[in-house]
Amino acid sequence: MIDPVAIQIGPFAIHWYALCIMTGLVLAVYLSSKEAPRKKMTSDDVIDFIIIAFPIAIIGARLYYVIFEWSYYSKHLNELLAIWNGGIAIYGGLITGAIVLFIYCYYKVLNPIRFLDIIAPGVMLAQAIGRWGNFINQEAYGRVVKALPYLPSFIQKQMFIDGHYRMPTFLFESVWNIIGFTIICYLRRQKKLLLEGEVLAFYLIWYGIGRFVIEGMRTDSLIFIGLRVSQIVSIVLIILGIVFVILRRRQKGIPYYQE
C-alpha cells in the first residue's frame, strides 16, 4: 500500500491527494491562461477567477459529499474537515465553481459562455490528474474482481483492498478524461467547426457519459432515495449539453470558436 502522506515535516503532512489536486489545478490554470488571449480575455481574468473560485469550490465539493453522507458525519463531527482523507465530490465542486463563475463574469463584464469554453479543457485534465489522489487514498474503486493482470504491479497492489482486488474505476475515469481533453483540444483549433459554447457542451456530454457509465461500476457511490447521485447529475449534464448545442445551432449570429 502506498503511504497517503507524501511529505512529513514534523507535525505537518502533505498528502498525495492534495498534491494531485494542486498539480491538476496548476496545469488547468496554465492552459486556460494561454487560451484566454485568443478569446479576447486576459490571463489575469483566469488567475483572478481561480484564486476566488478554487477555495469556494473545495468547500462546495466537501459540503456536497458530507450532505449525502450525513448519516456517517453526524456521528463523526470531528471528521467534517478531514478532506486529506478524501471525501471531495467533483460534482459539488463543479456546481459551486459554476455559480462563482457566473457571479464573477457578471461583475467583471465578461462573457460567461466564452469563459467556460476557455477553462473546460483544463478542468477535464485536472479531473484526470485528481483521480490519482483517489487511487492513493484507496477510494472511488469498483466491484471485486479476481485479478488485475493487465495493469502495472503498483496499481494491482493499491487496488488490493480488504482482501480483494477492486476494479480501478479511478483509472477508467482518468483515461476517459485524458482522451476527452485530447479530442477537444484538437477540435477547438479547427476553423469554423465548433461554435462558441460548444467546447463547454462537449465537456458536459463527454464527462457526463463517462461518469454515468463508470459510476455504475463503483461500490462507494453517494446514494439518495435509492439512486446514485452522480448518475442523476450525469444525465442532467448530458441533456444540458445536447440541448445547448441544438439551441446554439438554431440561433443565428453565434460566432465560431475558431474563425
Curated annotation (Swiss-Prot):
<dbReference type="GO" id="GO:0008961">
    <property type="term" value="F:phosphatidylglycerol-prolipoprotein diacylglyceryl transferase activity"/>
</dbReference>
<dbReference type="GO" id="GO:0005886">
    <property type="term" value="C:plasma membrane"/>
</dbReference>
<feature type="transmembrane region" description="Helical">
    <location>
        <begin position="167"/>
        <end position="187"/>
    </location>
</feature>
<feature type="transmembrane region" description="Helical">
    <location>
        <begin position="47"/>
        <end position="67"/>
    </location>
</feature>
<feature type="transmembrane region" description="Helical">
    <location>
        <begin position="83"/>
        <end position="103"/>
    </location>
</feature>
<comment type="similarity">
    <text>Belongs to the Lgt family.</text>
</comment>
<dbReference type="Pfam" id="PF01790">
    <property type="entry name" value="LGT"/>
</dbReference>
<feature type="transmembrane region" description="Helical">
    <location>
        <begin position="9"/>
        <end position="29"/>
    </location>
</feature>
<feature type="transmembrane region" description="Helical">
    <location>
        <begin position="109"/>
        <end position="129"/>
    </location>
</feature>
<comment type="function">
    <text>Catalyzes the transfer of the diacylglyceryl group from phosphatidylglycerol to the sulfhydryl group of the N-terminal cysteine of a prolipoprotein, the first step in the formation of mature lipoproteins.</text>
</comment>
<keyword id="KW-0472">Membrane</keyword>
<keyword id="KW-1003">Cell membrane</keyword>
<dbReference type="GO" id="GO:0042158">
    <property type="term" value="P:lipoprotein biosynthetic process"/>
</dbReference>
<dbReference type="InterPro" id="IPR001640">
    <property type="entry name" value="Lgt"/>
</dbReference>
<comment type="pathway">
    <text>Protein modification; lipoprotein biosynthesis (diacylglyceryl transfer).</text>
</comment>
<keyword id="KW-0812">Transmembrane</keyword>
<keyword id="KW-1133">Transmembrane helix</keyword>
<keyword id="KW-0808">Transferase</keyword>
<feature type="binding site">
    <location>
        <position position="131"/>
    </location>
    <ligand>
        <name>a 1,2-diacyl-sn-glycero-3-phospho-(1'-sn-glycerol)</name>
    </ligand>
</feature>
<feature type="transmembrane region" description="Helical">
    <location>
        <begin position="194"/>
        <end position="214"/>
    </location>
</feature>
<feature type="transmembrane region" description="Helical">
    <location>
        <begin position="227"/>
        <end position="247"/>
    </location>
</feature>
<protein>
    <recommendedName>
        <fullName>Phosphatidylglycerol--prolipoprotein diacylglyceryl transferase</fullName>
        <ecNumber>2.5.1.145</ecNumber>
    </recommendedName>
</protein>
